[in-house]
């Protein structure tokens, strides 16, 4: 048997509850400026004697509210529509159309609707929950006693005429003919002008009421982006849309997206605290929608409030409906589960506030069709019109129930932004189908699955790393016009230098009698008979020209001509011809060495040419080349070449037999410097 509570326990419980409510209100007053405060509105409860059977309501336009955002963030005005107020309808492309009569009525039926919502929905209490969520980064954790499961009259979404009536409310966009109405300033200065500047900035609400003022419908209409209605747009439209419906304020995607915050820290990584702070600024649509709703409840404190909207206005009405527990009917609304989770809206026990799409009994119904990329959450590809317009519409999940017309399968429509307009939806979808579709929840839907989000308190440290790289590149003294696999195949030129040389005609020859694996084990030095020492200071010019006409894989396979001209007394060069090259390297036949003839000034040398008819597979020459020794003309100088013959070449390199050396005999007259 449950234990009864004593009076003392009840008194303590009442005292703690009062302190909690006052603390939330104090927190809200400290965060929100005094200009935004309105009188405390009692919680909305079902009307007494609400009938269980559907009831017909006859609605008519009573007020037009306007809440400024960017250009006039403090502006809030109300126009009371009277019988003598003349209104004009404004089409979605911004052009004024025909006059309408303010007494025109719209019919809709109601049916019982169950909503799980907060028991205390007064504005200061709600603002306290939102402020606490913004401060801590998490939705307020509330006890089950703070929630109620209420059954109240709501729109009959199974009735086609009722759905059409709500769609017509969202399509009606009225302006007042100058001089026929009186705008009441709720907050801020209203600078009246015939051009109605408020059309271009802020959130506009059309207020419909039935004849008893027992049921009121708020139809929110945001500033329509030019991407949707063809009119001129502003940067503020993209900023607001990308802030609410993008994973990170238009960052991390296409370069065409308009960035509305700077919260991305790395690729697919963002600071969630930074995003939430940007979303809850006073000049954002969500704050404007709450202010507009609070003023309506001030006029109709005892009425049941229903909400409706199209596109961006539909998303804002859904967020307000989740906040205050109101019936909502939207059309082609932008998926709003992502901003609902980030705003920290309270969730009933048993539901994760990070996934508001999993909640039941929300009272929200979203009508749309499959050919609308905005409603389906697919207007974000690189080729989509949304992207080219600068909009980052990345959210894909709706809260509540989704009622979808499959126009792609039923009518063969292609997905396109032209099907998003509410007038097209009414004439081509809602009126053509015989019945309304069934409504289901999107519980298994997830937003921004590729992203990682972290929370911070604003004290994180950003570290910047600078890397310095030093690159050293070699300097070439020649230009290659025909490069090969492992070298240059075209002609090369060596620069001409002028030096002062001292030449001594002493030749030294070293013969290895016993070669080893890594050198010579028995070196023998033979010194030739020197000629008289000649010391000359002359310019030295060296020029080498190489031409390759038939390059191979690892070398040149055609004739190579070398022209050497030396004007000095250098050491004698040696040329060797190989008839039987080794398998890998070295020479296996008897080489022939020729010593060049040294000359004095007025020396002329003919070019030496070598021709290879059978080049090796990888490198070297396998045939017997033809060598031509230059004939020189010197005054009484005779030079005998030194030849060396190897009979037993080494396995890998070197010569294993005793070579034969012939000393050079030089005869020359006394040179003259």
From Swiss-Prot:
Glycans are attached at residues 156, 191, 213, 271, 295, 457. SUPFAM superfamilies: alpha/beta-Hydrolases (SSF53474). One of its GO terms (biological process) is piecemeal microautophagy of the nucleus. Binds to both phosphatidylinositol (PI) and phosphatidylinositol 3,5-bisphosphate (PIP2). It comes from the Eukaryota. Residues 29-673 are lumenal. It is an enzyme of class 3 (hydrolase). The chain crosses the membrane at residues 8-28. It catalyses: a triacylglycerol + H2O = a diacylglycerol + a fatty acid + H(+). It is found in: Endosome, Multivesicular body membrane; Prevacuolar compartment membrane. GO terms for cellular component: multivesicular body membrane; vacuolar lumen. It is a single-pass type II membrane protein. Lipase which is essential for lysis of subvacuolar cytoplasm to vacuole targeted bodies and intravacuolar autophagic bodies. Involved in the lysis of intravacuolar multivesicular body (MVB) vesicles. The intravacuolar membrane disintegration by atg15 is critical to life span extension. Its EC number is 3.1.1.3. Residues 1-7 are cytoplasmic. CDD domains: Lipase_3 (cd00519). This is Putative lipase atg15. The active site is at 311 (charge relay system). Keywords: Autophagy, Endosome, Glycoprotein, Hydrolase, Lipid degradation, Lipid metabolism, Membrane, Signal-anchor, Transmembrane, Transmembrane helix. It comes from Penicillium rubens (strain ATCC 28089 / DSM 1075 / NRRL 1951 / Wisconsin 54-1255). GO terms for molecular function: phospholipase activity; triacylglycerol lipase activity. Belongs to the AB hydrolase superfamily. Lipase family.
């Amino acid at each position: 048997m449950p234990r009864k509570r004593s009076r003392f326990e009840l008194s303590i419980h009442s005292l703690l509850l009062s302190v909690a409510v006052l603390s939330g209100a104090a927190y809200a007053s400290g965060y929100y400026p005094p200009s935004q405060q309105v009188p405390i509105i009692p919680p909305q409860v079902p009307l007494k004697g609400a009938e269980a059977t559907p009831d017909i309501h006859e609605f008519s336009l009573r007020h037009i509210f306007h809440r400024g955002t960017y250009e006039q963030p403090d502006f809030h005005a109300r126009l009371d529509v009277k019988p003598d107020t003349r209104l004009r309808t404004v089409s979605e492309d911004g052009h004024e159309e025909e006059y309408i009569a303010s007494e025109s009525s719209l019919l809709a039926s109601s049916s019982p609707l169950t909503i799980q919502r907060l028991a205390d929905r007064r504005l200061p209490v709600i603002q306290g929950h939102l402020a606490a969520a913004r401060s801590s980064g998490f939705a307020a954790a509330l006890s089950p006693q703070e929630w109620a499961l209420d059954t109240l009259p709501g729109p009959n979404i199974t009735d086609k005429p009722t759905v059409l009536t709500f769609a017509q409310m969202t399509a009606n966009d009225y302006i007042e003919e100058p001089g026929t109405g009186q705008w009441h300033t709720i907050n801020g200065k209203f600078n009246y002008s015939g051009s109605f500047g408020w059309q271009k900035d802020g959130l506009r609400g059309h207020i419909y009421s039935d004849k008893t003022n027992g049921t009121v419908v708020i139809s929110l209409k945001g500033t329509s982006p030019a991407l949707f209605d063809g009119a001129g747009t502003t940067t503020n439209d993209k900023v607001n849309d990308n802030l609410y419906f993008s994973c990170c304020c238009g960052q991390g995607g296409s370069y065409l997206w308009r960035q509305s915050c700077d919260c991305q820290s790395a690729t697919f990584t963002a600071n969630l605290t930074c995003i939430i702070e940007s979303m809850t600024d006073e000049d954002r649509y969500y704050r404007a929608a709450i202010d507009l709703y609070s003023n309506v409840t001030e006029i109709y404190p005892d009425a049941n409030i229903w909400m409706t909207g199209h596109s961006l206005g539909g998303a804002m009405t859904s967020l307000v409906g989740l906040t205050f527990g109101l019936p909502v009917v939207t059309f082609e609304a932008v998926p709003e589960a992502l901003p609902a989770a980030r705003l920290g809206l309270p969730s009933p026990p048993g539901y994760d506030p990070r996934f508001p799409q999993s909640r039941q009994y929300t009272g929200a119904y979203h009508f749309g069709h499959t050919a609308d990329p905005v409603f389906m959450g697919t207007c974000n590809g690189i080729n989509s019109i949304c992207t080219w317009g600068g909009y980052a519409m990345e959210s894909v999940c709706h809260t509540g129930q989704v009622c979808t017309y499959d126009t792609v399968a039923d009518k063969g429509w292609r997905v396109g932004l032209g099907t998003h307009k509410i007038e097209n939806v009414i004439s081509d979808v809602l009126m053509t189908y015989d019945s309304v579709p069934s409504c289901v929840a999107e519980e298994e839907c997830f937003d921004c699955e590729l992203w990682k989000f972290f929370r911070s308190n604003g004290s994180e440290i950003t570290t910047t790393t600078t890397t310095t790289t030093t690159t050293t590149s070699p300097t070439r003294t020649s230009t290659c016009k025909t490069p090969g696999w492992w070298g240059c195949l075209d002609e090369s030129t060596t620069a001409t230098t002028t030096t002062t040389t001292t030449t001594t005609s002493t030749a030294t020859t070293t013969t290895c009698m016993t070669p080893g694996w890594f050198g010579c084990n028995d070196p023998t030095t033979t010194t030739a008979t020197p000629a008289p020492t000649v010391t000359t200071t002359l310019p030295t010019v060296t020029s080498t020209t190489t031409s390759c006409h038939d390059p191979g894989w690892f070398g040149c396979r055609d004739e190579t001509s070398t022209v050497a001209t030396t004007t000095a007394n250098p050491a004698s060069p040696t040329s060797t011809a190989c008839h039987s090259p080794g398998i890998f390297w070295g020479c296996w036949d008897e080489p022939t060495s020729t010593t060049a003839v040294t000359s004095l000034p007025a020396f002329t040398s003919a070019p030496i040419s070598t021709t290879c008819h059978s080049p090796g597979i990888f490198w070297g020459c396998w045939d017997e080349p033809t060598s031509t020794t230059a004939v020189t003309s010197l005054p009484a100088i005779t030079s005998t070449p030194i030849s060396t013959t190897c009979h037993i070449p080494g396995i890998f390199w070197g010569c294993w037999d005793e070579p034969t050396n012939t000393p050079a005999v030089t005869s020359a007259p006394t040179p003259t410097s």
